[in-house]
Amino acid sequence: DIRKSRTLPSKFYYEEKAFNDSKTAFKGWQFALHSSQFQSNNIHPIEHIESITGEPIVIVKGEQVNCLSNICTHRGMRLIDQPCSKNSFRCEYHGRTFSIDGKFRNMPEFEGVIGFPSDDDNLLNFPMAVWDGLHFTSQDPTSPIPWAEVESRLGFLDIESYVHDPARDRDHSISANWMLYVDNYLEGFHIPFVHPELNQALDYSGYITETFEGGVLQIGKAMEGDVKFAL
């Protein structure tokens, strides 16, 4: 009963412990890139995921698509800074090389070292999942993936045929607790006051937010007679 609902205690928005505890949510499935981005380069560092998980990663396409750690297993040097096309990785610090699937290949001056290399010398390989050309990765493979919900709502769109246009990319840095921003995104009460043009295009009384395991869906209903599609 929504009449009995309450907002979170304010400490969740300003206490450091609460903020750090909330970061576990970031280890779930995150969108990385679209298949069309491999048309120009087969290696892509994914900065937007690093910014929220703290883990530098790179998506590479060889015989298959992998999500690898973007940090050399020797002294922690970043391996890839820009999208590029290569058949292997070579660390610019000490020359350690890795195959395109992240396996250790060679290290100068380490010939004859006993017990070397080991599995620890390979790059970490994180789980990946693909839906209709959209590639996702996770640091917690037990996180639920709501593919059934996504497919039932968006399956009619041929997203795999879409082509990424980097000119349309936008980055925004917001000085706020992430929960404040998500709260704002998930509620529509502010639309008539903050977004008057959007309010004219939407049937505000029909604004819907649906939650399900692993995801949330918002539906803004167009005015009668406007171009629209069904979700």
Model-derived regions: residue spans:
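Short, contiguous pre-domain boundary segments
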Residues: 1-11, 162-163
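Glycine-rich, flexible loop/turn motifs
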Residues: 4, 8, 75, 100-103, ...
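Glycine/alanine-rich phosphate-binding loops at beta-alpha junctions
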Residues: 4-5, 12-52
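Short amphipathic
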Residues: 11, 30-36, 165-175
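A structural signal for well-ordered alpha-helical scaffolds and beta->alpha junctions
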Residues: 15-19, 121, 147, 178
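Generic structural signal for secondary-structure transition and capping sites
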Residues: 27-30, 77, 190
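Rieske [2Fe-2S] iron-sulfur-binding domain
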Residues: 38-141, 151
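C-terminal catalytic domain of Rieske-type non-heme iron oxygenases
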Residues: 58-60, 70, 129, 134-231
